[in-house]
Amino acid sequence: MVNDLAHRHSLSGVGGRASVGEEKMILGSDHGIWDWANEDDGFCPIDWTKSQSVFTFLKACDGVWDTPYYAESIAMARAAGKLAAPYVWLYNVDPRMQADFWYLRLADEPLIVIDFESYGNSIPDYDDLYNAIERLRELGYTGKIIVYTGHWYWLAHGNTADYWKQFPVWLARYSSAPPQPTPTFAKEIIWQFSASGNPANYGITNGKLAVDEDWFYGTQEQLEELFGGGAVPPIDPPPKPQHKIVIKIRS
């Protein structure tokens, strides 16, 4: 747990677990290339044995581009006993093609997070997210899908259709207060509460100055079930990309 975290967030607990009133929370983190690459794009592996996170999400794909060293990073996280799953960044460029790209790499994963937010000139809308999800299902993906977004972004670019109620939501709010209710989702299951975690508490070795931190609401058993019940899917080398779109990489 980050130094003085209990004080800053009115939480109590140790060993990656806390509580707010009767609600149990488990500490996690999320990471992208900037957490495991150096200035020369070389691999600086996260030392997962020093990470206080119980679970972690790692960026696998940036639209239709592979994240360098993702396969190595998630394998190392799992070998260290972390519950680990991929997330993918959605752009407002041909969501079905992006889903094709993700499926080729992540079809065996029991859980995928789709990152639904803006970056630069890319401002995906709910129809981009819908088409990406439906294409994954059309291709045969049967695992869980979590939507990552922010309250205000969803109000501006999501909608309140009942369709979205089937998906767990992971909400970002860098605050001591949990995210606001975000229709039409039920309460978030994961809260990204900070982007300023101490790198030393998460095994960062490349000199990065801050880490994204998350709380999962629930028990260890519920967390393990979310991540596939302990199943470890195979990690194969990514296939050669069949399409190319010029997109800046975002961690």
Language-model features and meaning:
Residues 110-184:
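Catalytic domains of cell-wall/extracellular-matrix polysaccharide-remodeling enzymes
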Residues 65, 93, 154, 178, ...:
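Flexible, glycine-rich phosphate/dinucleotide-binding loops
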Residues 70, 87-89, 148, 174, ...:
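Aromatic side chains
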Residues 3-24:
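Short, Lys/Arg-enriched N-terminal segments with co-localized hydrophobic residues
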Residues 21-142:
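Substrate-binding cleft of extracellular glycoside hydrolase catalytic domains
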Residues 20-51, 160-250:
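Functionally critical loop-and-helix segments that line ligand-binding/catalytic clefts
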Residues 1, 250-251:
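Universal eukaryotic N-terminal targeting presequences
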Residues 9-11, 73, 194, 244:
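Compositionally biased, intrinsically disordered low-complexity segments enriched
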